[in-house]
Amino acid sequence: MVIANSNIIFVAGLGGIGLDTSREIVKSGPKNLVVLDRVDNPAAIAELKALNPKVTVTFYPYDVTVPVAETKKLLKTIFDKLKTVDLLINGAGILDDNQIERTIAVNFTGTVNTTTAIMDFWDKRKGGPGGVIANICSVTGFNSIYQVPVYSASKAAALSFTTSLAKLAHITGVTAYSINPGITKTVLVHKFNSWLSVEPRVAELLLEHPTQTTLQCAQNFVKAIEANQNGAIWKLDLGRLDAIEWTKHWDSGI
């Protein structure tokens, strides 16, 4: 996918990995970057606008845990303004296994609901033009950090959902791929709670191992966007971008 002159919606585009990725996207010259985030950050939006004045950067407040009907209303506002949207990035995520329901609501259900809502505008069965979805999942969807099983399971669920979306592209016209960052130096990983406090030092222990910067992750994220490979399972770890071959252990046969 060519980012230049495209219209992109980025859910959680002001977070740790999100903000650096928004910067890299803006540098590539889309026509519009629409940032949806729970917390407004006027300074970050102003920075993005100044980074490339030719790009129209717009912000809307958005909590991914709202009902699908509310998301559809927001998307209608965006589609009425832009007419077309080429790419949806679902990037909302929290890492706190003390918040079980919210972890699942943000990391998994929010991704499903936002995707479901945009199908009203993209699904070719409804006369839509199709589109592309990039879901930010995690390497913990491959193999869990067992001290944070709720977070890991929520990301595995998001990965499975994304893989299914890709398989449905011939029906819906909507393609999808997953972005799976390794341990990245963000506020998210500097301090977080393990499930039932099974390992109070889990964040500290993780950061004793090699990590990557948000900029490294963002630069590889843009490469994955440009590759635009339906069904791709991208691993963004230690400054590298690698396509993962998923091992099939069972097939529904349908």
From Swiss-Prot:
Substrate binds at S138. One of its GO terms (biological process) is alcohol metabolic process. It comes from Drosophila planitibia (Fruit fly). One of its GO terms (molecular function) is alcohol dehydrogenase (NAD+) activity. Its EC number is 1.1.1.1. NAD(+) binds at residues 10-33. This is Alcohol dehydrogenase. Belongs to the short-chain dehydrogenases/reductases (SDR) family. It is an enzyme of class 1 (oxidoreductase). SUPFAM superfamilies: NAD(P)-binding Rossmann-fold domains. InterPro entries: ADH_Drosophila-type, NAD(P)-bd_dom_sf, Sc_DH/Rdtase_CS, SDR_fam. Keywords: NAD, Oxidoreductase. PROSITE patterns: ADH_SHORT.
